[in-house]
Amino acid sequence: MGFQASERVVALNAQLEAFMQEHIYPREHEWEAFTLDQNNRWQVPDWFDVLREKAKAEGLWNLFLPEEYGDWGPGLKNVEIARIFETMSKVNWAQPIFNCNAPDRGNMEVLAKYGTAEQQEQWLKPLLAGDIRSAYAMTEPQVA
């Protein structure tokens, strides 16, 4: 199967790569040093939220929601999103900068597709804004 990226996706991917070059790649050593310090467990560096705000301001936010989810995302096709994620995933901690990380991403997809208006208001909108985090839990029948 061949895939020819649209001009929009090529431009978006170039914008994402430029952001990665300017803000993400230069911080890889800082990130590693920060995470190796056990005192920082479950923390993020001070600059992390600054980068999230920059990504949001540059329109590099919630890029994962495909066209069938309507106004919640940029309206890309799944095959287009794959190209974006290929770039984003070059650094293992980059996806949260763009609000495209698990488990939030999957939970937002479920809420966008199946959530009631009330659930979307209470949970989806704050997740899309990056104001809250989510979790995913699963058990087996007759276990819990």
Task: Go through the PLM ranges and name each one.
Residues 9, 20, 116:
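Residue-level signal for inorganic ion chemistry
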Residues 29-144:
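Glycine-rich flavin
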Residues 1-16:
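Intrinsic disorder at enzyme termini
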Residues 18-26:
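N-terminal glycine-rich anion-binding loops that anchor highly charged ligand groups
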